[in-house]
Amino acid sequence: MSIRRGAEVTTGMSDERARDEPGPGVESVAGAVGGKATPRSGRSRSRLRGVFRVVAALVAAATLVWLILRDTSPVGHFDSAADKDRYLDAYHEAMREMPEPERVLDVRTSYGIVRVYRYAGPAETGEREPFLLLPGTRSGAPVFAANMAGLLAQRAVYALDLLGEPGMSVQDRPIETHADQARWLHEVLVALPEKGFHLLGLSIGGWTAANLAVHEPEKVAGLILIEPVQTFAGLSTELMMRSIPVSVSWFPKSWRDDFNSWTAGGAPVEDEPVGRMIEAGMSTYTMRQPQPSRIAPERLRTLQMPVLAIIAGDSPMHDSAAAARTAQENLCHGTVKVYPGASHAINGEQPQRIAADIADFLAD
């Protein structure tokens, strides 16, 4: 496809004596036996100094190796060509669960190229603002496969891969602030022909949508936030503790599968295409961007567009009751739904209910 530049669309102690003298308040062993050190004690100190030298040399060598091998890239990237191939195999397998896109777009932004898929909705939808789907972290557009039928029955759909995350989008400039996060997404919306969009974000995609609406709301017609993290409540302590080991790519794959199953309410994920894609993203891609911080309630109160918040009653990510309460108290034009018994994988568990609630929300 041709390329438009700008926000454009294309179609990837110093001496030996000082060290041996005791410090203040330390009794010298030599002094206790008449001021003379026995040959045995001298040999012991000599051996001890030798051990210290060996340890110091090992620490220095390890530090040098770390300095040589450490990852200094300022942008998100796959760790190797083989890792990229492994992820893309899983990504393309998961994409086969999606309908065929009408168009595949690569949108040039100030921070990199963003992969966008467009899916045609019913012909009679006319000028209705389309959905723009924002996936969770370490996944990609295919995470919405279970939701596409219910959404496409209502209007056209765009789905993208988040910039700085594993997927088909390619980051080429550092994303350093939450304003940067909003800027690249705003540039994507500006490059698309529609006047406005209903942003539908899942998990970190929900935070990404709300963050855009806080910083650059011009093209945001509405927000649909499904289990958004760091938006209405902070992350749970258990989540933070469980996520530490799975953030190390060379730890066993089974640990990442167990973590992903835990977030999905115990459902097995290793045999699902989307589950394999997410695990591959966790183990092959290094992210380089600021961690999302909690959106302050006073900023939520500035949102003037309609907002639908869907919270999982059994979410392991946050306190669901507290999240629902924050949304109800601070959204000026908010509709809050809590799904009892649902896990963080709510979009795949209850796609029909989500589609029906979205249709009712947009009809009001």
What are these regions (language model features)?
Residues 310-342:
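Conserved loop-alpha-helix segment in the C-terminal half of the alpha/beta-hydrolase fold
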